[in-house]
Structures are given as C-alpha cells and as structure tokens.
C-alpha cells in the first residue's frame, strides 16, 4: 500500500466532557461551569469540547499518526504528548483522576491532574 492510501484507525475518548447535556444537567453554562462543583466536586476535572477537538487537530497534523493505529487514546493522554491545552490553559487528565482520586474515594482535588 502506498503512503497516499495509508489509513490509521484509532479510538479517541474525551475525559469528563462538559457537553451541553452535562451543563444542562447541572444548571450551568460553559462560563459558569465551576458552580456545578457545589453539586459534584469531581466535575472539577471536566474538559471542554474544544479540548477533545484539539486532540483531533493534533492527530490530523501528525505525520507519524500511524503510531496510534489500533489504539484507544484519551484527550488527556494526547495533550501530554502533543502539548495542547483546554480553553483555560490546563491539561485535564480525567481518566487518571477518576481512577486515582474519585474511584479511590478521595476528596476532589485536581492538583496534578489539570
């Protein structure tokens, strides 16, 4: 197969996405999303839809994107590798946070995860 016809297949998952549905569920907007922390403190690790969009852009611009073929990657994982950030300048790593903090029953603290 020539490089012109090569394809890469991967799975990209966002972290805890601040989608319109999530914002509506908490009665907040993208501008006021931190107010939702009163109801769900772990929502502090959430990411904007732009963050996963930036992951797609980074993949599209990578001439070596085939290294991801057959893999499942997260927006937080790719942010560390490609260096992009969320709208607030952070790099939320929701999946690591969910395992190490939320699932472990620890209080909400995004230090080292955002």
Task: Tell me the role of every PLM-derived stretch.
Residues 1-4, 60-61:
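Alpha-helical segments that scaffold the active site and NAD(P)H-binding pocket
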Residues 4-15:
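Conserved beta-loop-beta element that borders a ligand/cofactor-binding pocket
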Residues 11, 32-114:
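C-terminal helical subdomain
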Residues 14-24:
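Short, flexible catalytic-loop segment of classical short-chain dehydrogenase/reductase
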Residues 26-31:
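Short, hinge-like loop/turn segments at secondary-structure boundaries
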